């Protein structure tokens, strides 16, 4: 064994979680190293070439507000941008971009190379070193030993990876990367409760083999409506490519069903549990038998490649069946598969074995992030990576760690769900998972999280100055709207010009903006646009004014819940001695060890009656094991 150095924080893996973890730890001043099997796989997109989407776009904005990298990378490498759910309320608006996967990798690799205090190593980590229940370092396949105060596991689907295509399988990570089998055994030996999950990816096909005249075109939003992910991005945006939509048909479904037993998922070869909200095409055909078609989104992988990604058509069927069912689709009759679809099975940890800081309860100083924690998706991974890296660094430096309550962010909701409720299948963030989604909008992520990022050392001076300036602009415009009166004649003229039924009378601009038919641009046509108010800020201001009553109600809910969050539970509380609890509640509370009464009430199987009993016991005084 060759001792090659010591670090405050070591990050294993340089995918979306590992990048944010390494960047966050180094930004906080911790001496940091990130290990990856290949420098050419940093920030790889082994599945869809896109960032954002419903709820995921909010996670990216939150990452950016805290000082993360993903938003800037997406803004620098996007090909097409669309705001999803524009016909619905602002709570579910979601930015999504197609990205150039090669340029995204290059951006992220360079971002890490430019990060001060961060060492980048191409090496496979085969084991962690643990002493007296605390991580002490890692060992590589070349017998290199590196000491560390804290380690972040961000292994993606490489950990114990196994790829399936029909009845063929082989040990591998995604995109031909090695499987990290030795590390799995080391983590098991350290006492981590591991399990098997599964995910999949569709075929990549050659652009020239698609008849686009048979597909529906899916353009991006008009250039003047485009919004960046990062609060720091000022560059003008324009769409560069179009996406397309194809549809399966009854013949496609017949081919799949006739060969369903050749799928390793249905033939019993795959043990791992797949994602509920991103099913394979064979799953869709079986589970939704009454549907006669399913959409397939045809997306470019980059500007300098002819590979096209078939979103919505992941599969693990044999190659001959893939050829047959893809070619049964209108526009795909002559399809050329460049990379076949496959399923991948991998190891991950039971997230209820983690603290809300993402530190392991089994091995102190060891943190998890991304798919290792049982989630799916680049955005979920990156968000956890930032939190794990931040907390690993603060732990190593002897500082207080950050716990984000679920009412602060989608990231806080995600982590609370993982460590409190656990997962039965790969976890995907959705707006419906948050009870505070009107407050946790993508447009106000900076207001919610940038001060926290500043307090914990992640937000640098340029971002902080930008945040303060933005808040000053919004505050000034809110005051102007509150103080400005519109004459009835002027308002009616503006409404008639916009094709709207004229209002009865004028009034204070702020009060008028509460009306559903009146928009900020309409008012601005009368009183002028506020100084430095962009369309993006105008939309944010309008949302806050129009929904002020609902937001205030949600704020009251948050304050009520916060009282339970402040009722702390001793780590050694003797649940088994509390006879008023149900047996299920006692078992789950003893296993998960919630930090406070609020978290206890969110554990599945713990009823309001159990929470009341626990509250009484806590008020009565110490009850320890």
State the predicted function of each range.
Residues 38-40, 56, 83, 184-323, ...:
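An anion/pyrophosphate-binding glycine-rich loop and adjacent beta-alpha core
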Residues 433, 439-441, 445, 450-612, ...:
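Extended, charge-enriched "interface" segments that sit outside catalytic cores
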Residues 150, 155-159, 317, 330:
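Glycine-/small-residue-rich beta->alpha transition segments that form the dinucleotide
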Residues 5, 141-150:
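Core beta-strand elements of the Rossmann-like FAD/NAD(P) dinucleotide-binding domain
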Residues 381-402:
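Internal hydrophobic alpha-helix adjacent to the cofactor/substrate pocket in enzyme cavities
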């Amino acid at each position: 064994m060759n001792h090659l150095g010591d670090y405050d924080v070591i990050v294993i893996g340089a995918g979306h979680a590992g990048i944010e973890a390494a960047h966050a730890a180094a930004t906080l001043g911790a001496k940091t190293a990130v290990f990856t099997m290949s420098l050419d796989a940093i920030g790889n997109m082994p599945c869809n070439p896109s960032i954002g989407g419903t709820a995921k776009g909010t996670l990216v904005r939150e990452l950016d507000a805290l000082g993360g990298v993903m938003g800037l990378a997406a803004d620098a490498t996007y090909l097409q941008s669309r705001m999803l759910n524009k016909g619905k309320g602002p709570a579910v608006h979601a930015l999504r971009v197609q990205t150039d996967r090669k340029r995204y990798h290059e951006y992220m690799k360079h971002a890490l190379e430019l990060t001060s205090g961060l060492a980048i190593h191409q090496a496979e980590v085969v084991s962690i070193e643990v002493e007296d229940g605390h991580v002490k370092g890692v060992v590589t396949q070349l017998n290199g030993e590196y000491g560390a105060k804290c380690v972040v596991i961000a292994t993606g689907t490489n950990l114990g990876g196994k790829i399936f295509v029909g009845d063929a399988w082989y040990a591998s990570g995604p995109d031909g990367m090695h499987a990290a089998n030795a590390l799995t055994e080391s983590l098991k030996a350290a006492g981590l409760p591991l399990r098997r999950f599964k995910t999949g990816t569709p075929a990549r096909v050659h652009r020239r083999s698609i008849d686009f005249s048979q597909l529906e075109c899916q353009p991006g939003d008009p250039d003047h409506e485009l919004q960046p992910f990062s609060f720091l991005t000022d560059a003008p945006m324009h769409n560069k490519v179009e996406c397309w939509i194809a549809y399966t048909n009854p013949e496609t479904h017949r081919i799949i069903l006739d060969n369903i037993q050749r799928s390793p998922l249905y033939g019993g070869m795959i043990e791992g549990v797949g994602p509920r909200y991103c099913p394979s095409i064979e799953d869709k055909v079986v589970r939704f038998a009454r549907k006669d078609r399913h959409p397939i989104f045809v997306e470019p992988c980059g500007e300098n490649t002819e590979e096209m990604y078939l979103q919505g058509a992941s599969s693990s069927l044999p190659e001959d069946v893939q050829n047959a069912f893809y070619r049964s689709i209108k526009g795909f009759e002559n399809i050329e598969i460049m990379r076949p679809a496959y399923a991948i099975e991998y190891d991950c940890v039971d997230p209820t074995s983690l603290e809300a800081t993402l530190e392991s309860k089994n091995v102190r100083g060891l943190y998890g992030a991304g798919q290792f924690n049982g989630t799916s998706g680049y955005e979920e991974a990156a968000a956890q990576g930032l939190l794990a890296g931040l907390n690993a660094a603060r732990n190593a430096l002897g500082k207080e760690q950050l716990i984000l309550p679920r009412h602060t962010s989608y990231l806080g909701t995600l982590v609370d769900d993982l460590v409190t409720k656990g997962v039965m299948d790969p976890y995907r963030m959705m707006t419906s998972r948050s009870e505070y989604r009107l407050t946790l909008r993508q447009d106000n992520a900076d207001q919610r999280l940038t001060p926290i990022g500043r307090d914990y050392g992640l937000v640098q001076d340029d971002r902080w100055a930008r945040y303060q300036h933005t808040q000053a602009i919004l505050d000034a415009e809110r005051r102007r709207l509150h103080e400005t009166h519109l004459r009835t004649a002027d308002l009616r003229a503006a409404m008639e010009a916009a094709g709207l039924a004229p209002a009865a009378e004028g009034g204070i601009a702020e009060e008028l903006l509460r009306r559903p038919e009146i928009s900020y641009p309409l008012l601005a046509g009368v009183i002028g646009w506020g100084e430095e108010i962009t369309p993006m800020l105008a939309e944010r201001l309008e949302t806050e004014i129009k929904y002020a009553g609902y937001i205030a109600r949600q704020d009251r809910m948050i304050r009520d819940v916060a009282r339970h969050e402040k009722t702390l539970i001793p780590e050694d509380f003797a649940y088994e001695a509390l006879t008023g609890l149900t047996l299920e509640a006692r078992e789950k509370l003893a296993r998960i060890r919630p930090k406070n009464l609020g978290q206890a009430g969110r554990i599945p199987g713990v009823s309001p009656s159990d929470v009341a009993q626990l509250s009484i016991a806590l008020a009565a005084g110490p009850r320890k094991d």
